[in-house]
From Swiss-Prot:
Complex formation: Associated component of the mechanistic target of rapamycin complex 2 (mTORC2). Binds directly to MTOR and RICTOR within the TORC2 complex.
Tissue spec. comment: Ubiquitously expressed. Expressed at high levels in kidney.
InterPro entries to which the protein is assigned, alphabetical: Bit61/PRR5 (IPR013745), Cullin_repeat-like_dom_sf (IPR016159)
GO biological process: actin cytoskeleton organization; cellular response to nutrient levels; cytoskeleton organization; negative regulation of apoptotic process; phosphatidylinositol 3-kinase/protein kinase B signal transduction; positive regulation of cell growth; positive regulation of cell migration; positive regulation of phosphatidylinositol 3-kinase/protein kinase B signal transduction
Role summary: Associated subunit of mTORC2, which regulates cell growth and survival in response to hormonal signals. mTORC2 is activated by growth factors, but, in contrast to mTORC1, seems to be nutrient-insensitive. mTORC2 seems to function upstream of Rho GTPases to regulate the actin cytoskeleton, probably by activating one or more Rho-type guanine nucleotide exchange factors. PRR5 plays an important role in regulation of PDGFRB expression and in modulation of platelet-derived growth factor signaling. May act as a tumor suppressor in breast cancer.
Name assigned to this protein: Proline-rich protein 5
S-S bonds: none
Species of origin: Mus musculus
């Protein structure tokens, strides 16, 4: 009995006793929460003061950057970390941009251009890298600190001052920093897509950069170009008569899927087999002669291997014409061949000069220097083959 009575007195406290102890425990928890909040507020204030000091050109003391980094890491672990982006936009960046804007807000003309260029140099070279270093623990989240800072600079400074009027003035000298600023800001986009502020920025870029390919087309000093943009590759060469540069015509292919030539076979000439010499020549395989549009004018030009001319009027229907090898031996005397003294430069000049008058392409007649030999390469019907 004594043992049971002793166990009864040693048992857990009653509910009334627990009720008396709850206010003390709750007060301890509340004091701990208040201490954590006070510590978080102190961290917020230190980050706020450090960022504002950067915008005020005061810089950061030694070891201050490390302290701010640790403060940002601690805040991200608390319940206040979810509001970090909103606090950065509404408090830190907005106040900092207003500090920079107030110094140039009432400037106009050339003074505004020079002051804005100096402000951009300071922001882009000092403020932006420092902000990225302070908020380094936040990297990987979208939108990034760099993107938020550039968007606030665009909306608070670039689009709020009288920059368009300053650029529209005659004899305005645009500093290179202004062009850099506009092009850098043009590369920053919002999650909503193209906004009205972005289109206003493009209007400013058109006054500095020409030509400029914007959201709604190509702009130049003469005005917007509504036609489609065509990239043209220009080839320049030296004329035979002098140093005049001429434009090379574009050689177009009528079919990109059907090859014009079949594989080439090699065989030894019959006439040289008995003499013991091993001379090989390439047999001319089947070449499809595709019809070309009408209206070409013959423009003969002397080349090293034949005559270049345009194709005559094609006949109707498909292109079944074939190229057949000549019946006579391919070997010719030294008097009938192409001149051996022709250099590659002369060859290129002759080809380009013969093609200057043809806007559709280059057509080659595989002749041997005489009209009689050219007829051997003609397809049935007297139509020369076209490459």
């Amino acid at each position: 009995m004594r043992t049971l009575r002793r166990l009864k007195f040693m048992s857990s406290p009653s509910l009334s006793d627990l009720g008396k102890r709850e206010p003390g425990a709750a007060g301890t928890d509340e004091r701990g929460t208040q201490q954590r909040r006070a510590c978080a507020n102190a961290t917020w204030n230190s980050i706020h003061n450090g960022v504002i000091a950067v915008f005020q050109r005061k810089g950061l003391p030694d070891q201050e950057l490390f302290i701010l980094n640790e403060g940002v890491r601690q805040l991200l672990k608390t319940e206040l970390g979810s509001f970090f982006t909103e606090y950065l936009q509404n408090q830190l960046l907005t106040k900092g941009m207003v500090i920079l804007r107030d110094k140039i807000r009432f400037y106009e003309g050339q003074k505004l251009l020079d002051s804005l260029a100096e402000t951009w140099d300071f922001f882009f070279s000092d403020v932006l890298p420092t902000l990225q270093a302070i908020f380094y623990p936040v990297q990987g989240k979208e939108p990034s600190v760099r993107q938020l800072a550039l968007l606030h600079f665009r909306n608070t400074i670039t689009l709020s001052v009288k920059l368009e009027d300053a650029l529209a003035r005659s004899h305005a000298r645009v500093p290179p920093a202004i062009a850099q600023m506009l092009l850098v800001l043009q590369g920053v986009h919002e999650s909503r897509g193209v906004t009205e502020d972005y289109l206003r920025l493009e209007t400013l870029i058109q006054k500095v950069v020409s030509p400029y390919l914007g959201t709604y087309g190509l702009y130049s000093n003469e005005g917007p170009c509504t036609h489609s943009c065509i990239l043209e590759k220009r080839f320049l060469r030296r004329s035979r008569s002098g140093d005049i540069l001429a434009k090379n015509p574009v050689v177009r292919s009528k079919s990109y899927n059907t090859p014009l030539l079949n594989p080439v076979a090699e065989h030894e000439a019959e006439g040289t087999a008995a003499s013991g010499t091993s001379i090989r020549r390439h047999s001319v395989s089947e070449m499809t002669s595709c019809p070309e549009p009408q209206g070409f004018v013959d423009t003969p030009g002397q080349g090293p291997s034949g005559t270049f001319r345009s194709s005559p009027t094609p006949h109707s229907g498909p292109c079944p014409s074939r190229l057949y090898p000549p019946a006579h031996s391919p070997e010719q005397g030294p008097g009938h061949g192409s001149p051996s003294t022709s250099s590659p430069e002369t060859l290129v000049d002759q080809i380009l000069e013969s093609a200057d008058s043809d806007s559709e392409g280059i057509f080659i007649d595989f002749g041997r220097g005489s009209r009689s030999s050219v007829s051997d390469f003609e397809a049935p019907g007297g139509r020369p083959s076209v490459v």
